[in-house]
């Protein structure tokens, strides 16, 4: 046994290893000559063709197996030109420790320099090691993610892994030096910091206001896409990652980032999309909106306005809106108006509009050398041309229409930015980039006036705050599994927007009751922090 160990380990190119490679190469050469000889025999037309049976299959299998062996032995073959490296590797057992514990990963910071993730020195059974620490626990878990030697990494920890570990070595010598530092533990490699666009104070307030309720908050700058808030509840503590998080079913889905991946019916907030399409197409007429509602056929339930149900619960009779135009229809969030408007515009217009607004796609919001972080926009299946009622439902944000809070925030930002949607971004060093034009500048300007009116005297008037000039659209999305979801999207200030937002509260009821107050509180703090004039 000692002799075998000596032959295998004492030198990078021992006699036994040379013999094994020689036998393998001779066997491969013999098999190759047999195959070539067989091809030559087949080429003789006057002789019967030999049958390629088990023998040929065996040769192919052996050749494939040999290729695998060659691949596995490449480090030994290349090692002949790097004897110092081979000798070094033979002297160190890499199984004794995990190199990931030894790297001093860089910090993850918010836009103001507040530390969101850092590496701290700890003592383990194998000696000193580095452990990732997240000062705010669950507040940034879905964005920052986690980095754990046992379970890998997620979020920015995964997307920016190379930068956080010190950057990508530029040469084989750099790789070798990094390996020596890790294995000998003579010097702890230090990573680079990554700065995000988030504001820790705003993010923490969003998480606090959502509380135990499931939901999401997205706040961004319309002009450059810088995300100030990307909050999702319920969350998890990245300081306490364990196997149960991934193995046990969680009815509350704490690992799901509802802001970027949660799909919800957008309800009345989707009327902004239909209104933008109508204005781009030059619509300027009025639509009769009866109090008792409207439907495409007697076979289907009537689509009604929320005032109808409020009056019915109070024992009153509602007179209806009568004939109204788009401005009043959007400010008062009339389902009857937009259901008819969507059917009037038609299936082709609806499909073209949702494609222009980038539904059914993904957008990169954070990109590093080792990965990307995405946001889903939504999911809207094709509506059959014969399904007029399905189109009517979709036009008021119900039916088969689903959207993420991040997508609805992007739509609000496009209205605030004269129709141009700028890619939401998490990493401060990334350059702003437009993802498309959602609507014409004139359409965006008119929508800003209408959405300001919606807060001043329409469905969002409950959060009207002096000095903020909030413009927005409430949404109450029907939910087959319980109480309606509460939405509020918009921007502020209305005349010169600096921040756009979307707030979703699952099972929150009316948008003006649950989601809108959260947006108002965030905007008040944003003004104190200097994000708003």
Regions found by a protein language model. Give the residues of each.
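Beta-lactam-recognizing serine transpeptidase/beta-lactamase-like catalytic domain environment
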Residues: 181, 223-268, 273-507, 511
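Periplasmic/cell-envelope proteins involved in peptidoglycan metabolism and beta-lactam response
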Residues: 1-245, 254, 263, 268, ...
